[in-house]
Amino acid sequence: MRTQKHSLHRRPLPNAAVQQFKLETWHKYSLYALVAALFASGLVWLLARYFLRVTGEYGESIHPLEHWAMQAHGALIIPLSFLAGGLLFQHMRRAHRALRNRYSGWSMLATLLWLALTGYALYYFASESLRPYWSAAHWIVGLALPLLLWLHIRLGRRLSA
């Protein structure tokens, strides 16, 4: 009997593989900690930028927290990118094939890509006239990220129960 090598339809995952899209504990808590730290550093930057301006003899100047918060925020992106990339095979691909939590998963991926794109734009090619727009596009979505992550987790747990 001849087996078909290629098909337009994917074979469903075996039951053991379906359950393997749950994250390991260290991965899950590392992601939670990094998202919380990114949220906190972004929030500190927002507060320093818009509410803690220092007025000196030459006018308004930046608050020292603004610079440090931005540096911490940029540094935290590196490990988050590494851990988010680790989700691709084990978590995202298998959950997608198992038809689990697709809408919130794709929303999470689109949000992370948007934040990466706008963050890159702010760092590399935003002109001074467009910087406020790129910045708002970044921090408005960034403030919504913890809520979207919570919703994604909540829906995933509800579906698995």
Predicted regions and their residues:
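Membrane-embedded alpha-helical bundles that constitute the cytochrome b-like, heme-associated redox core
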Residues: 1-161
